[in-house]
Amino acid sequence: MTESRRNFLKFIVAGSVAAGCPINLSLLGAESPTRPRVDGEHFEICHQVRDGKSFAKPPVSKRYDVVIVGGGVSGLSAAYFLRGHDFLLLEKEPQWGGNAYLEEYEGQAFATGSAFDEKGTASEQLAREIGLTLLPINSKDPSIIAGKWVPDTWRSGLDQLPYPASVRESFKKFRAEILALDPDKNVQQLDNEPLSKYLKGYAPEIKQWWDAYGPSNWGANSEDTSAYVAAGELQYITAEEDTRVTLPGGNGALSRQLASTLQPKYAERMISDATIVAVDQQQTEVRVTYVHEGELRTIAAKYVVMATPKFIASRLIPAIPDAQREAMLSYRYCPYPVINMIFDKPVYNRAYDTWCPGNTFTDFIVADWVLHAQPGYVQKNNILTFYTPLSEVQRRELLRVESCQKIAENVLGDFQKLQPEFASAQPVEIRMYRRGHPMFLPTPGTFTEVIPAATQPLERIVFANTDSVGPESEVSGAVEAAHHAAEWVEKKMAGTTTASVARTASAVSA
């Protein structure tokens, strides 16, 4: 990209990079070469929590039935399920939604992370309950490989791959072997084996494809992916029916609808920009200390729902047993920037999600795809969302705006090289939303060993979030975890017998 083009293009960076901390940075193109202007918050408080600093805790200022920590889909869902109680919802970011957060350009919504759901899931059912109708995607995923557009990659597309016949045959043999594994009957075995074990002996092009698909969907390459997850996924993408549903903005549409449903009646019980520094379980209550508007505050609750990733919960709650804390700290999380490119003319509308192995990005989606089938719809801007997961060692690159801009430039450059018709594509704006720890990696053993050990409720604290359910990070898991946590709280508050609460606890960690 030329320097003049770089300065003309509007480039915006936002998102959360530090562990458990908000950061909002923006870089706007100027008419002359100038140093990028960076605005954002400092990380001192969050880094002090990470490093084990103890904060002076003010006296309890107010008491609630339940405090929910984390305002992503899981926390918002828990608040919705527990809305009949005196709850308080705390969120570290200035907005609600967590990984499921949408942004808009001239009234057009697009996803900054979590992109779609499936028919019949807990999250899709919740969406319908609160008045949101998700639309069918009905688009089998193509791939662009060596300049060729290959439709329905893992079904009819295998015969169209731009590879020698021996490589295409290798794809077919791999598909047959994995589909024969029957993951439902071999959960323990397959979850403790890496996908890479099953790739041995096959054409390297198969590994290249999965090393794009895995990082995009669950943050891990084939060496770090449970074979159980991959086997289930291949069944899913080779099925006859496309069960995916979404709206422009992805699952951010659900989080926005949840927040809009709750705020008219419960706005005073929903506090954003609140950085939690301690969650102290006492004999009769839990005390939660947080920083809001520059002040430390402590409130208390009978019970707490921790709708945060486990690496955050493990640092905030002293009462967690050592073995459970060790399990929590064994989770691994991927750094993940998502780049939206806004074009003022049609560039690509051939499919919803297109895979591009071997590039800076893994795949890209058409933001308004599901609206194309709606009567009378006319696309104003062609917004393409590029998924650009990084390796864990690259996380620090997201802390510098210059590095983020370079990533975005590489994504645009790779896109322009995919096919001749993309060569002249120039966006009017690029928006990058970066997250340092959005998804846990489904490494071998995480689903069957780590999650059960890490998610056991304490006496007054229960754990939600997608990493309480597994086997991978999905919006349905966020809602399932919230529902189980809400049931646990309800039974605790009702004084249900220990055995009954234990059964609910088992569901939470299932």
List each language-model region with its residue ranges.
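Extreme N-terminal leader/targeting segments of oxidoreductases
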Residues: T2-Y64
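Conserved flavin/dinucleotide-binding core of flavoenzymes
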Residues: S32-S54, D353-W355, T360, V366-A510
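Mid-domain catalytic core of redox enzymes
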Residues: V60, S272-L384, L418
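N-terminal Rossmann-like FAD-binding beta1-loop-alpha1 element of flavoenzymes
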Residues: V66-L88
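Glycine-rich FAD pyrophosphate-binding loop
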Residues: R83-E103
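Glycine-rich active-site loop/strand segments that organize a redox cofactor
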Residues: G98-G120, E177-D184
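Mobile amphipathic helical/loop "lid" adjacent to a hydrophobic cofactor/ligand pocket
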Residues: E124, R128-E129, T133-T225
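Active-site/ligand-binding neighborhood in enzyme catalytic cores
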Residues: P183-A278, E285-R287
